[in-house]
Design a protein with these regions (language model features):
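Short, low-complexity N-terminal intrinsically disordered segments enriched in polar/charged residues
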Residues: 1-33, 64
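Hydrophobic pocket/interface hotspot
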Residues: 14, 26, 34, 49, ...
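A short gly/proline-enriched turn/hairpin at secondary-structure junctions
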Residues: 33-44, 55-59
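A generic structural motif
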Residues: 37, 86-88, 105
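Surface-exposed, charged secondary-structure patches
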Residues: 51-97
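Short beta-strand edge/turn micro-motifs at domain boundaries
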Residues: 78, 96-129
Length: 129
């Protein structure tokens, strides 16, 4: 189980790194096998997602955190974060009420400079709320 403070910090680090287009920081928050499932249903491997951020195909301009809650789904610890996010995704710009459910695992290779939480996301599921 992830403590509320660590959950909020992990989610905040992810949102801030997305807006900064800091792919190294995002990488430090995700496991090697992490997949982001977009609200369209497209499952995007981490390497592809980070590539799209690096080349500007996906630009996160701003976010306002509305809520961050630790939770469990089928016994797995998750962080359920809700933001109002402005982004340009593959050419289309908009502002969305974005929910990301991040499945959390202990960090087997801690990078305390970029990720001091002791956890990483192994899966991210995006939807609207």
């Amino acid at each position: 189980e992830i403590a509320p403070r660590a959950a909020a910090e992990l989610y905040s680090l992810l949102c801030d790194a997305m807006v900064a287009a800091d792919t190294k920081a995002i990488d430090a928050l995700l496991t090697d096998y992490c997949v982001l499932t977009h609200m369209t249903g497209y499952p995007q491997p981490k390497v592809e997602w980070l590539g799209d951020i690096a080349n500007g195909a996906m630009r996160y301009h701003d976010h306002e955190v509305v809520s961050v809650q630790p939770d469990t789904i089928a016994g797995f610890p998750v962080v359920r974060g809700r933001t109002r996010t402005t982004a340009t995704l593959w050419g289309g710009r908009g502002t969305w009420n974005l929910q990301i459910v991040g499945y959390v695992v202990p960090d087997a290779d801690p990078d305390t400079e970029r990720n001091p939480t002791g956890f990483r996301f192994s899966r991210l599921d995006a939807s609207t709320w």
